[in-house]
């Protein structure tokens, strides 16, 4: 294996988000940390296709290796959903994480310049670092509510830029380009020598405009990524995909031959049903999330300046700043220890005074989480007053 990531896992930096969630996720009683919609059960999925994995089908399922690009039925379902552009094909993967790994391993060499929208999910920056790339942040500025400023992107692009890596809607802030901004972004990349990596994990979770179109419809040098973990409520299936230029397929398959080879036929059968019934899974969760988003914004507005919350334009997370804190990590620890409430401290995204709050959960769970935060903020404020009295 000749790619820079072939140097071995020791080249990969720690993943602070996963380090935070690893044990706390299983300790929490109230989870308002998640960047995905709340999960579906197998029974709920089977209700969409009662024949799914019945006794007869299970008995006939052959546990053989799958095709390198993925099961044909699942690939066809994804293609019908996302509509890849000319010269692009769908490859299914073990979550979008595998697809991202394959892309960075295939495309990046030591010293390459990689532009990453920042703050970033750890895979988007960490894989570039492990590949020996020179990172150039495209800053999504907190003072602008993390709204993407394409002039800032223009300023960091150069003739040495190998990749431009974006994630819209953005994790953790929920910021998003609108359709006009998408067109301008694609034009900027088209006029450079760079390849665009478009993380579309949250594509279906938008609040102010229709979902953004698949970028390969308008750009040749692009790979896009999707997953069942965020909008579909099926993270435990560990299924994702990439839309990849045909001329790059053989390189991704070559690298995959050293990793996972293919997906389980059992998992791909379940995943195909999910994608074929995408709207039935996504629509109710998105409707619920929009109601909950309104509640989070009302809660923040009622905090008398203690919480400054940019409006999430997409996704199901808010990323508010806590104005009396320079680092909310201790607050997050207290929420879990005293209330059983799980949130994510902003330091894992390089924004220590912020907290990621997931709002796609049942309303009672969200209310418990917000009430616990308010209680801890009140305790903190009273302590400060005593300390200065």
Curated annotation (Swiss-Prot):
It catalyses: (2S,3S)-hydroxyarginine = (2S,3R)-capreomycidine + H2O. Pfam families: Aminotran_1_2. GO terms for biological process: antibiotic biosynthetic process. It comes from Streptomyces vinaceus. This is Capreomycidine synthase. Involved in the biosynthesis of capreomycidine, an unusual amino acid used by non-ribosomal peptide synthases (NRPS) to make the tuberactinomycin class of peptide antibiotic such as viomycin and capreomycin. Catalyzes the dehydration of the C3 hydroxyl of (3S)-hydroxy-(2S)-arginine and the intramolecular cyclization to yield (2S,3R)-capreomycidine. Disulfide bonds: none annotated. Its EC number is 4.2.1.145. The modification N6-(pyridoxal phosphate)lysine is found at residue 230. Keywords: Antibiotic biosynthesis, Lyase, Pyridoxal phosphate. It comes from the Bacteria.
